[in-house]
Design a protein with these regions (language model features):
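Conserved alpha-helix/loop element of class I SAM-dependent methyltransferases that forms part
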Residues: 31-60
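A short acidic, Gly/Pro-enriched loop at the edge of an enzyme's catalytic core
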Residues: 119-129
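A short SAM/SAH-binding and catalytic strip from SAM-dependent methyltransferases
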Residues: 127-143
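Conserved class I S-adenosyl-L-methionine
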Residues: 158-201
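Short alpha-helix
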Residues: 214-237
Length: 280
C-alpha cells in the first residue's frame, strides 16, 4: 500500500469526522430534508416508498443500521416497533438519544461501526433489519454488510433496504446533461471514490471543516448476490424515480418531500428498494 493510500478503516474514519460535523447542521436543517420541528409535532419521517413496503411493524424488533440521528428510528418506534439504532457517529447517537428522551419514545441507540453490529447488538435478535437512504454508498464491502445484516436476524426475519440507485451514483450533471463520470463498481480502499465538498446536502449553508470523504458504488447485481451468499432470500426489488434529496441540480421537488427529474428529461432510476428474508 502506498504511503498516502488509506485503508478502508481509515477512509471510514475520515467519513465519520464529516458525519460528526454534519449532525448539528442537519438538526438545524429547514430545507425539509430533515424536519425536526415537524417530527417533534408528531410527523412521521418515513417516505411513501418505505410506508408501502415495510408493512405493519407494531411489536417487531428492528435494528436500524446507519441510523444517523434517529428520526426514522423514532418514527418506527412511533409505529409500535421496538427499535435499536446503530451509527458510527457518537455525535449522531447522542443527538438521537436526546430526541428519544424529548419525545418519550423508547428506542435505544448504540455507537459502533456497522460491520461490528453483531458484536454491538447481538446475533439473531431482530425481526427486521432496516436500512435507508444514503447508507450503503458509505460502505467499502457490500458482501460483508449483507452477512452482518443476515446474522442480526431471527430465522424468517426480514431485511428492508431503500437507497440511492447505483446508476445515479455514477452520474454528474454538466450543462443540464447527465454524464457518466464514475465506475459502476468500486470496492475496498484502492477503488474508493474521493470527494471534497464545502457544504452538506442539507442544512443552513454552513461551511464544513471536514471537506474530504470517500464513497463506494455497488451495482444491483453485487447487492443481490451479496444477499444470497449471506443467507437471505430476495423477496422483491423495486426501482423508483424519486429520492429524498436533490441528488443532481436538475432534480425538482416531488410529492412527499421527494425529488425527481423533470418529466421531459430522460434519466435512469434514482432509487431502489428491496426486501429479503433470512433463510432458516
Amino acid at each position: 500500500m502506498a504511503e498516502d493510500e488509506l485503508s478502508s478503516e481509515a477512509q471510514m474514519a475520515v467519513n465519520r469526522l464529516k458525519w460528526d460535523e454534519r449532525v448539528p447542521i442537519h438538526i438545524a436543517d429547514r430545507t425539509g430534508i430533515y424536519d425536526v420541528p415537524g417530527f417533534l409535532r408528531g410527523n412521521d419521517t418515513l417516505k411513501s416508498i418505505e410506508d408501502s413496503e415495510i408493512g405493519d411493524v407494531s411489536g417487531r424488533r428492528i435494528a436500524h443500521l446507519q441510523c444517523h440521528f434517529g428520526l426514522d428510528s423514532l418514527s418506527l418506534a412511533r409505529r409500535g416497533a421496538t427499535v435499536t439504532g446503530l451509527d458510527f457517529s457518537q455525535e449522531a447517537v447522542t443527538a438521537a438519544k436526546g430526541l428519544a428522551e424529548q419525545t418519550g419514545l423508547g428506542a435505544e441507540f448504540v455507537c459502533g461501526n456497522v460491520y461490528d453490529a453483531v458484536e454491538h447488538l447481538g446475533p439473531a435478535g431482530f425481526d427486521m433489519v432496516y436500512v435507508s437512504w444514503g447508507a450503503i454508498i458509505w460502505l467499502p464491502d457490500i458482501a460483508r454488510w449483507a452477512a452482518v445484516a443476515s446474522r442480526l436476524l431471527v430465522p424468517g426475519g426480514r431485511l428492508y433496504l431503500a437507497d440511492l440507485h447505483p446508476a445515479l451514483a455514477q452520474l454528474e450533471e454538466e450543462d443540464g446533461k447527465l454524464v457518466f463520470t464514475y465506475p459502476r463498481r468500486s470496492h475496498g480502499s484502492r477503488e474508493a471514490l474521493k470527494f471534497h465538498e464545502d457544504q452538506s446536502y442539507a442544512g443552513n449553508g454552513a461551511v464544513l471543516g471536514n471537506k474530504q470523504h470517500f464513497e463506494w458504488i455497488h451495482p444491483l447485481s453485487d447487492i443481490v448476490t451479496a444477499l444470497h451468499e449471506g443467507g437471505l432470500r430476495l423477496d422483491f426489488l423495486h426501482e423508483h424515480d424519486m429520492l429524498p434529496w436533490p441528488g443532481l441540480p436538475s432534480m425538482v421537488p416531488a410529492p412527499d418531500g421527494m425529488y425527481r427529474f423533470p418529466d421531459q428529461m430522460i434519466a435512469p432510476p434514482v432509487a431502489f428498494s428491496l426486501g429479503a428474508t433470512a433463510r432458516s
